[in-house]
Structures are given as C-alpha cells and as structure tokens.
Amino acid sequence: MYRVGFGYDVHKIDKPVKTGNTCIVLCGVSVPCEYKVIAHSDGDVALHALVDALLGAACIEGANDIGMLFPDTDEKWRGKSSSYFVEHVVTLIQRAGYVVNNADLTIVCETPRIQQYKSEMQQQVADLLCVRKEQINVKATTTEKLGFEGRKEGIAAYAIVSLTKIRP
C-alpha cells in the first residue's frame, strides 16, 4: 500500500538584537542569514513540514501532527533540534511498517538564499529518513516580495512524502 502525506509550517523571522553572525536552520543545515527565527524549537520550518507530511502519510493514531507529539507548550522541546523530531517520527513509521519512497520540500522565503546549501540539505534529509539522496528534493522559491515572506516577516515550507507499507 502507498500513502502520501502533506505538511506545511511557518515561523516568524526578525532581525536579531545583537549584530553578528546569525543562522537559520533549514533541513538540519545552518544557513547564514541576517535574520533569526522566532520559534520554540530550533525553528527549522522545512523539517517541521516534513514531520507533518510523514505523520499525515502514516496516519498513526494519537500522532497525526507535530503539535501532538512535540507541543510548543512543553518546555522540554524548547530549543530542541528538529532533526530529533524527524528521527523520532521515522522510528514511529518504521514500527508501523512503512518506508519512505521519496520526499519533496519547498522552502518559501526572500532570505536566506539557499542554492549553495541544497545538496547538503538533500543529504541531511536523506540521512534522517534512511534513504538515498536521489529520493529527496529540496527547492526554494520567493513570493516576488508579496505577503509575509516577501516582506521578510516569516519563512514557510511545504513538504510532500510518499510511503510504502512493507509489513503489517
């Protein structure tokens, strides 16, 4: 059986109070940026969207979205790496008998520019999902300066995942 899941996430971004080197974490990769993400965890919108896509595809009772498993009201998730969230969810879907066929992620932002980091992002996501890099696509787009992304008020990501049930 094949299953498909879709995920979306958004976080506010803001100029840091102190000047200096800042980064935004995207797909588990630190990308230099003049903005910081306002979030409870590390704010990796791409991995958060991926977690929701994985959970949506697997339809595991009691764990159908990121907020159920890792609520932002729980202090134990404050500053937590989103890679941990993906690893935990991969364990859940593997226990449920699923493997990942492929994942496609789109990051929507005016900043940072991610072209030079895409290959590293693909590899990081592939490693987290226990698949080959060729099974992962990461791309970015802007909104042509429209909306909150265009005004550099936030960053968003979409993810779609295909799973195959290999055992009951």
Swiss-Prot record:
The record marks H40, T142 as: Transition state stabilizer. It catalyses: 4-CDP-2-C-methyl-D-erythritol 2-phosphate = 2-C-methyl-D-erythritol 2,4-cyclic diphosphate + CMP. Binds 1 divalent metal cation per subunit. Homotrimer. It comes from Neorickettsia sennetsu (strain ATCC VR-367 / Miyayama). 4-CDP-2-C-methyl-D-erythritol 2-phosphate binds at residues 9-11, 40-41, 65-67, 70-74, 141-144, 148, 151. InterPro entries: MECDP_synthase, MECDP_synthase_CS, MECDP_synthase_sf. The gene is ispF. Pathway: Isoprenoid biosynthesis; isopentenyl diphosphate biosynthesis via DXP pathway; isopentenyl diphosphate from 1-deoxy-D-xylulose 5-phosphate: step 4/6. This is 2-C-methyl-D-erythritol 2,4-cyclodiphosphate synthase. Its cofactor is a divalent metal cation. NCBIfam families: ispF (TIGR00151). GO terms for biological process: isopentenyl diphosphate biosynthetic process, methylerythritol 4-phosphate pathway; terpenoid biosynthetic process. Belongs to the IspF family.
